[in-house]
A protein has these predicted regions:
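Helix-to-loop junction immediately C-terminal to a conserved catalytic motif
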Residues: 48
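ABC-type ATPase nucleotide-binding domains, specifically the catalytic core motifs of the NBD
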Residues: 12, 30, 93-113, 121-123, ...
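Conserved ABC ATPase signature
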Residues: 132-136
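ABC ATPase C-loop
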Residues: 149-150
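The feature captures the beta-strand-to-loop junction immediately N-terminal to the Walker
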Residues: 33-35
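Conserved catalytic motifs of ABC-family nucleotide-binding domains
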Residues: 153
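Conserved ABC transporter NBD signature motif
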Residues: 56-65, 76, 110-115, 217
Length: 235
């Protein structure tokens, strides 16, 4: 499991995360709700090895995730799908996907197997495999970004704001794809502002405010919480 204990992150004198505690059990989808600036992306950067913490620990299956290099965390089974997708728009869909397998570049046969698996998970991409990634719709580009992360063969997928900028119908399709990824055996930590969509597929969740965990609970508990309903569900 993922276990984060008293994790704090500073940017100079500014503290972005304050003693964050959270867990993701094997096979779970856990949502991290929070507004812009709440600290969600900072947490993900820290878990993926892009940012060093000021204090605290984070482990996946007992192996430390902090203090190393990002490629080490990918090799340990933790992959980040970043906010904004960050595709190479002039490269084909398939070339973008193959870049996600860089950490396994010596295993050509395994890369081909994984490519087939992600096409099974995202069948809409099969007919677009030779098209420039930048020519796809926003929803299709998000699916390419998720699929590229899966090419690293993660056991834990960190998804940062996958619904950003997408129309409601497309959000529904993307979250259905995330559910399929989870059903294939991948644990998911999902950072989102779209609480309705995220809690629709999550097992549990946390609310991050000002870099602190202010609330946590099951899907049902968070959907029924007046603070969540007011701040994130608009009811």
């Amino acid at each position: 499991m993922l276990e984060v204990q008293r994790l704090s992150v500073n940017y100079g004198p500014f503290r972005a995360l304050h003693d964050v505690d959270l867990t993701v059990q094997e096979g779970e989808i856990v949502v991290l709700l929070g507004a812009n600036g709440a600290g969600k992306s900072t947490l993900f950067r820290t878990l993926s090895g892009l940012q060093r913490p000021s204090a605290g620990t984070a482990t996946w299956r007992g192996v430390p995730l902090t203090g190393g290099r990002p490629e080490f965390n990918v090799a340990r089974g933790v992959a980040l799908c970043p906010e904004g997708r960050l595709l190479f728009p002039d490269l084909s869909v398939e070339k973008n996907l193959r870049l996600g397998a860089f950490v396994h570049r010596r295993d050509a046969a395994g890369t081909e197997r994984e490519l087939g698996r992600v096409y099974d998970l995202f069948p809409d991409l099969v007919g677009k495999r030779h098209a420039p990634a930048g020519s796809l719709s926003g929803g299709q580009q998000q699916m390419v970004a998720i699929a590229r992360s899966l090419m690293a063969r993660p056991q834990l997928l960190l998804l940062d704001e996958p619904s950003l900028g997408l129309a409601p119908l497309v959000v529904e399709q993307v979250f259905a794809a995330i559910s399929r990824v989870n059903a294939s055996g991948v644990s998911v930590l999902l950072a989102e502002q779209n609480a309705f969509a995220a809690l629709g597929i999550a097992h549990r969740g946390y609310v991050l405010e000002g870099g602190r965990v202010s609330l946590q609970g099951s899907q049902e508990a968070l959907l029924g919480d007046d603070r969540v309903r007011s701040a994130y569900l608009g009811v």
